Amino acid sequence: MPCYSPLKGWRDVETGGIVFKASRKAYETMEVACGQCLGCRLDHSRHWAMRIIHESCLHEYSGGNSFITLTYRDKAACTEDEFRSGFFIPDSWSLNKKHFQDFMKRLRSRYPDKEIRFFHCGEYGNICRHKSEVKDCAICTVGRPHYHAVLFNHTFDDLEVIGTNQGRVLYSSPTLAEIWKYGHVQVGDVTFESAGYVARYSLKKITGNLAEDHYVSVDEDGRLHYLEPEYITMSRRPGIAKDWYDKYVSDIFPSDEVPVPGAGVFKGVPRYYEKLLEADNPHMLESIKELRQVFMAAHADDYTPERLMSRYKVKKAQSAMLKRTM
């Protein structure tokens, strides 16, 4: 997918790196992806989805995988014990990274013999604290905080069917609810669609000068609360899908295509895989990049400002249909 707002850069002769200010050392003007436009953000989320599926393949026949959603209960819905322990939605209605961190500690403590890995996002819903749609509220800019995560090498053995969503079966798990403690939970299957759902947090995140005013909540008493922006965290050491890459690198390079079980074969290799190849075989990576430049030159008409704007409008309309209903 193209960047719709590419930046102008130059390749440094001595280092081979990219600079954004011309100098005597620099040569060969080139366009560099901005990293912030819709095209870049969709690429970023798709690359994460690829890696999530690749990581899940490593555990499919051992511990299995789970796609989970963790939500908060209202303070008014608490039992006495839950109220005393603070297991309800924060007064600020903000995401809280520590809540998920503590959840993972409790989960791993419950299953000490399992090496449970994860990829998770924190995001906000569409219903605000004043019980209306965010888009219809004159005060709120975000909705109810909640979390989505893919758990690798773990499934729950007490799943209860609670419904379906767009043909996907959804479950509850008393064990998961007990470990989470803060409210309702859902469990689903790990698919390329659910992986992309977790990774598309970036489409909602506001950056730059607009962020300061966007991530503010006003409670019923008129107090201001500054909110944690949407975010992701994941298991490291090794990185997500590192072991899969080590086994199947020849399926990606030098063809420069990425096979994703259940989803097909994709052009556009995750940058993480490129970094791994650069460490092992920098000459192959340079050759692949040169071939990409040849392809871009041969299809230059597809990358004119006018053409990019047309493609942007189409992609924006398509992305609006990616409803976050899980």
PLM regions: where:
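Long non-globular sequence segments
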Residues: 1-21, 266-326
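Intrinsic-disorder/low-complexity loop/linker signature
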Residues: 8, 16-17, 25, 71, ...
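Residues in well-ordered beta-strands of folded domains
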Residues: 38, 69, 119-122, 186-188, ...
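Short beta-strand element of the conserved SAM-dependent methyltransferase core
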Residues: 70, 149-153, 310
